[in-house]
């Protein structure tokens, strides 16, 4: 992963309610006594399963506290990242608990909580690859990320071609097998991967002024 010249990215929870009707959704949640969160469950340390197969993570804990404050039960439905936003749109989820980055485009469509985490975006490459150490080095390279993620958008803005994946595990497999050159993700997510890695780790490639 690399520190790169990217704007600060706010991590927050995102709700299905638009700015026009947030009270309607809140009333529905309180009436049924339950708030339903969409989450991946495969993105450590934010939302993942522990050794007892329990859904845990920082986003999960924040969502549980939100439910507690509302006086309702928190229910989590797991799905792939690229389907979570559609699930919010379609009413399958009331909100997302999955490190949703606030962007201008998303803010026009969704309500966000205040940011509760700031993360740094980093470039992950194979340990023996010295050709990529900055965002500019991604030009002409192939990266792996979930298609609708801000990481994919960022990589493409620097001239990379993005291969779509379902989750971080698939991303790392493609990278270590040489099918892609790099991937972008939160720096802390990469460090979490190292804790449980069963294959030789990829390299976190630092670059100046990287933040997200």
Show which residues each predicted segment covers.
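Bacterial lipoprotein signal-peptidase II cleavage site
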Residues: 1-11
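Extracytoplasmic small-molecule ligand-binding "clamshell" domains
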Residues: 10, 19-99
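A structural signal for short loop-to-beta-strand junctions that line the ligand-binding cleft
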Residues: 26, 58-59, 107-117, 202-206, ...
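Beta->alpha turn/N-cap motifs
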Residues: 38-43, 77-82, 91, 95-103, ...
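Ligand-binding cleft/hinge of the Venus flytrap
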Residues: 47-52, 63-72, 148-167, 194-199
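Short helix-initiation/N-cap motifs at beta->coil->alpha
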Residues: 60, 76-86, 130, 148-149, ...
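Periplasmic-binding protein-like
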Residues: 117-125, 187, 191-212
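Flexible hinge/capping segments at coil-to-helix
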Residues: 126-142
């Amino acid at each position: 992963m690399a520190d790169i010249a990217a704007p600060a990215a706010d991590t927050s929870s995102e709700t299905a309610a638009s700015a026009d009707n947030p009270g309607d959704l809140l009333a529905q949640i309180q009436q049924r006594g339950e708030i339903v969160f969409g989450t991946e469950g495969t993105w450590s340390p934010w939302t993942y399963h522990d050794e007892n197969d329990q859904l845990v993570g920082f986003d999960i804990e924040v969502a549980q506290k939100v439910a507690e404050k509302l006086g309702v039960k928190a229910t989590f439905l797991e799905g792939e990242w690229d389907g979570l936003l559609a699930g919010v749109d379609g009413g399958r989820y009331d909100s997302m608990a999955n490190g949703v980055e606030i962007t201008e485009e998303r803010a026009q469509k969704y309500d966000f909580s205040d940011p509760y985490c700031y993360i740094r975006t980093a470039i992950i490459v194979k340990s023996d690859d010295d050709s990529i150490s900055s965002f500019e080095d991604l030009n002409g390279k192939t990266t792996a990320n979930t298609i609708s993620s801000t990481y994919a958008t960022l990589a493409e803005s620097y001239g990379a071609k993005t291969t779509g994946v379902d989750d971080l595990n698939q991303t790392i497999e493609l990278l270590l097998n040489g099918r892609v050159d790099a991937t972008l993700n939160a720096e802390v997510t990469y460090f979490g991967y190292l804790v449980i890695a069963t294959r030789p780790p990829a390299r976190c490639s630092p670059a100046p002024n990287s933040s997200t």
